[in-house]
Amino acid sequence: MTPEQFLHRCKVICHVGPVGVWEQITKHGFRTAEQLILEADLTEEERQALLSTPRRESVRLSVRGDAVTLRDQGPLFARKDLKSILGDGLDASDWIHLLNQRVYFFTDETSMRKLLDKYLQIDGGQDVIWLSPLKLIEAAGLRLELTSQNTVTIARQSGAQKMADAFAPLWRFTDRKPTEATILGGLDDLSPVFRAERCFQDGRRQILT
């Protein structure tokens, strides 16, 4: 996929997080789960568990004195044996390591709204950050990686579904709409952000930037 094809396919790029995530992003950039876990106030045993096992529920961390929430990875528990859907010799800890190394962005508003509605029902509010696809390409460079599937959901089919090459750089991804856009290692440059808003369950919206 060329940059021009990406821009044609992806008119919308956005990130959804718990209330307060925008303030954290303005201070520290888009941080990966791995980065947050490594910086959090945890015992070494707790840290290693979070780095290598899926999160059945959301996890609250204290990072540099700030309260940070890591989303649950509940859909991965749809199978009793996660390894049964992993290919290329991956085990569960390998897959979780791959997931934790990246920040995730929606590439269409429909799928974003589905997750937003889910967490509005649970938490009452969420922060939504909108980014320019063009500026995201420029800021992320080769660290921008795309997927053809939701990397934390499991389809109702047998055989391997999650492979080592699930995250493909732009140049290796075929010309089709990606399911997810991810950035390996996070993103400090916030120039792609053009709007941030706080959404509430009752329909109210608060413009943050």
Regions found by a protein language model. Name each.
Residues 1-55:
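Gly/serine-rich nucleotide phosphate-binding loop at the start of the catalytic core
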Residues 2-8, 44-103, 107-209:
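Conserved NAD+-utilizing ADP-ribose enzyme module
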